[in-house]
Regions:
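A charged, aromatic-enriched C-terminal amphipathic alpha-helix characteristic of glycosyltransferases
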Residues: 332-366
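Short hydrophobic beta-strand element within catalytic cores of glycosyltransferases
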Residues: 289-298
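Nucleotide-activated donor-binding/catalytic signature segment of Leloir-type glycosyltransferases, i.e.
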Residues: 226, 233-254
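Acidic donor-binding loop of glycosyltransferase active sites
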Residues: 262-275, 288-289
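A short, histidine- and acid-enriched strand-loop-helix "catalytic/donor-clamping" loop
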Residues: 86-87, 104-122, 131-134
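Donor nucleotide-sugar binding/catalytic pocket of nucleotide-sugar-dependent glycosyltransferases
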Residues: 132-181, 187
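Conserved donor-binding/catalytic core segment of Leloir-type glycosyltransferases
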Residues: 182-202, 208-211
C-alpha cells in the first residue's frame, strides 16, 4: 500500500531519513516549491517525487496547490506530512479528512507544543492534534507537554532530528588534535566556537560580552565564528570596541565538512546564546559540548541534547552575566576531562539524534490504514 508524504521543502539535512523511509515503504513524495533560503536535496534520489506549486510564495500565509486533491486519491489511505499552521490548504485538508475520510490515517511531523502559542495558534494546533492519528514531535519536551494536555502516549512520539550522520561519522573517526587554533591565535587558551549563520536572533553579540567579562576577571578565551551573515560587520566592530580582536577569528562560511569537523573537534565549547537548533547536533557529533539558554519555550528542539555537566550547560535567558558564569563553570568542573566530554557528546548523538533512531520511531509508530 502506498504512503503519501508531503513536506514544505525538501531540505537537504533530511536526506538520510527521507531515503530510509523511501526504502522502508512504498512512497509517493510531494514537496512545496524549492526555497531560495534552504539548501534542498535533489528529489530524484527518492523513487516517486513531485513538486507542488505555492500560492502567495514567500509570505507567512500561503497555500499549496494540489494538496487537497491528494486526499481524494483512492490509492492513498495513509498520509505522513508536516503540519503547517499558516498553509491555507492544510486546514480544508484536515476538515475534509475528519468529515469524510475517517478511515484514512494521517500522521504529522511537527514541532508540537512550545508553550508560547497565541490564542489563535493554540486553537488551530489543538484542532490539528485532535484530527490526526499520529503526532511525531521533534523532541521530548513537546511530547511531554502534549501528554500533560491529555493526548494519548499511543498518539504522540518524539522523532527528534538529524543531519548527514553516516558521512559525519566517517569524518569523526578521522579526527585528532591539531594546532588549528594555536597556529591562528598563538596561544593555548580554550576556544569557544559558533557554527552557523550570523543572524540577530542568535544573539551572538552575547558571546563577545561574556568573554569580555571573563577577560576582566583574568580568564582568557578565544572565539571562532564559523559562518557569515548580516551580523558579521556589527560583531567585528563590537570585538574591536571590547578590545577582543586578537581573541576573535571570523572564519567565514565553510562548506567543507571535513574542515568543519576539524574546527569543531578542536574547539572546547560551542556557545549558542539564542536558539541552538541543529548546531547542537552538528557540534556534538564531533565531540564539542554546548552552552545555550534555558527558556525552553523559545528554544529549538535540539536543546534537549544538552545534558547539564555532561554535554553542556544552560544559562539564564538573555543574561550575559549568567552566560559568562556558565562558561567559567564549564571549565572549572571537578575532574574536567576533555576526552570524556567528547565521548558524552558522541553518545548523545549516536543514541538520539540520527536517522537510525528516527526510522525506528517511524517503523514502530506510524499509523497505517488497513
Amino acid at each position: 500500500m502506498k504512503i503519501c508524504l508531503f513536506f514544505n521543502t525538501p531540505s537537504i539535512y533530511r536526506e538520510a531519513i527521507y531515503k530510509m523511509i523511501d526504502k522502508e515503504y512504498d512512497c509517493d513524495w510531494f514537496f512545496g516549491e524549492l526555497s531560495d533560503d534552504v539548501k534542498c536535496l535533489d528529489i530524484k534520489c527518492l523513487k516517486h517525487s513531485t513538486i507542488l506549486g505555492i500560492g502567495n510564495k514567500g509570505r507567512r500565509v500561503y497555500w499549496t496547490k494540489g494538496l487537497i486533491s491528494l486526499l481524494f486519491k483512492k490509492k492513498y489511505k495513509t498520509y505522513f506530512m508536516y503540519g503547517p499552521t499558516w498553509d491555507l490548504s492544510f486546514w480544508p485538508f484536515l476538515i475534509i479528512k475528519a468529515l469524510f475520510f475517517r478511515k484514512k490515517k494521517l500522521n504529522i511531523w511537527v514541532h508540537g507544543w512550545y508553550g508560547k502559542e497565541t490564542w489563535l495558534e493554540g486553537i488551530l494546533k489543538k484542532f490539528m492534534f485532535h484530527v490526526v492519528d499520529g503526532i511525531f514531535c521533534y523532541g521530548d519536551y513537546a511530547k511531554k507537554m502534549l501528554l500533560e494536555m491529555g493526548y494519548s502516549k499511543d498518539k504522540v512520539f518524539a522523532i527528534h532530528n538529524s543531519l548527514n550522520y553516516d558521512e559525519q561519522l566517517t569524518l569523526r573517526k578521522k579526527q585528532h588534535d591539531t594546532e588549528v587554533y594555536k597556529s591562528h591565535f598563538h596561544n593555548e587558551n580554550p576556544t569557544i566556537i559558533f557554527l552557523g549563520r550570523l543572524t540577530s536572533i542568535k544573539r551572538l553579540d552575547m558571546i563577545l560580552d561574556a568573554v569580555s567579562i571573563l577577560k576582566q576577571n583574568g580568564q582568557l578565551f578565544n572565539i571562532v565564528y564559523v559562518g557569515n551573515g548580516p551580523m558579521r560587520d556589527m560583531l567585528e566592530h563590537k570585538a574591536k570596541v571590547l578590545c577582543l580582536s586578537d581573541q576573535v577569528w571570523f572564519y567565514g562560511a565553510c562548506y567543507d565538512e571535513e574542515k568543519n569537523a576539524e574546527l569543531v573537534y578542536n574547539a572546547d565549547l560551542c556557545v549558542a546564546p539564542g536558539n541552538v537548533g541543529l548546531t547542537a547536533v552538528h557540534t556534538m557529533m564531533f565531540g564539542c559540548p554546548v552552552v545555550t539558554h534555558d527558556n525552553f519555550a523559545y528554544q529549538m528542539p535540539e536543546f534537549e541534547a544538552v545534558k547539564p555537566s555532561k554535554t553542556g550547560l544552560f544559562f539564564d535567558f538573555g543574561n550575559v552575566e549568567s552566560l559568562a558564569n556558565q562558561i567559567a563553570n564549564w571549565f572549572s568542573q571537578d575532574n574536567y576531562k576533555r576526552e570524556a566530554i567528547r565521548e558524552n557528546c558522541y553518545m548523545e548523538v549516536d543514541t538520539n539524534w540520527n536517522p537510525y533512531y528516527q526510522i525506528d520511531i517511524v517503523k514502530h509508530n506510524l499509523k497505517i490504514a488497513d
